[in-house]
């Protein structure tokens, strides 16, 4: 999917989530090879539908901002795929982007560059694909109303601090 990142910035109830949810519907259909890759990954974590065991639609994953780095990247005693691998050949949507733990967000950098993630444990090392489109959204300030018809209660300093939660190296990758 290449290293494609979209960033949606806007006040509350603007429709950022709805726009993100529509992205998989305008992407090309999965090829047979992509479909089998996605199906294998979902099979490992027991996420296949019994009535339709082959996944034919591009994944759309939207983890909560409280997710840990290991749940996002993958891990465990017997390493399992994380959200980035479950989003392989699809979309990973991170809503309320600045609310994610900084270490969790920074953990995305290498897998995004490589299109894969390697999880090492004492007795094993496994690599899962992680070629996904990252779509992140955020409000322009902590209260979410800056720029809208509703009065923003945030100070200029709190808005600046809120926007600075996103690192420069990650912003460099955003379209």
Could you tell me what each predicted segment is?
Residues 106-126:
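Conserved catalytic/switch belt of AAA+ P-loop NTPases
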Residues 53-59, 66-92, 125:
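Conserved alpha-helical scaffold flanking the Walker A/P-loop in AAA+ ATPase domains
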Residues 60-61, 80, 85-89, 119-140, ...:
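AAA+/SF3 P-loop NTPase mechanochemical coupling elements
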């Amino acid at each position: 999917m290449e290293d494609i990142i979209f960033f949606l910035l806007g006040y509350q109830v603007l429709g950022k989530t709805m726009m993100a949810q529509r992205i998989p519907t305008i992407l090309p259909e999965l090829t047979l090879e992509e479909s089998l890759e996605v199906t294998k990954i979902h099979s490992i974590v027991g996420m296949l539908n019994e009535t339709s065991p082959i996944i034919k639609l591009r994944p759309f994953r939207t983890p909560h901002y409280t997710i840990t780095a290991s749940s996002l990247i993958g891990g465990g005693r017997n390493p399992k795929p994380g959200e980035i691998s479950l989003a392989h050949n699809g979309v990973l949507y991170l809503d309320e982007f600045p609310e994610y733990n900084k270490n969790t967000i920074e953990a995305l950098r290498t897998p995004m560059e490589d299109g894969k993630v390697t999880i090492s444990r004492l007795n094993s090392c496994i690599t899962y694909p992680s070629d996904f489109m990252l779509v992140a959204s955020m409000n322009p300030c902590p209260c979410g109303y800056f720029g809208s018809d509703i009065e923003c209660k945030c100070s200029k300093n709190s808005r600046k601090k809120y926007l600075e939660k996103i690192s420069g190296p990650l912003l460099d990758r955003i379209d």
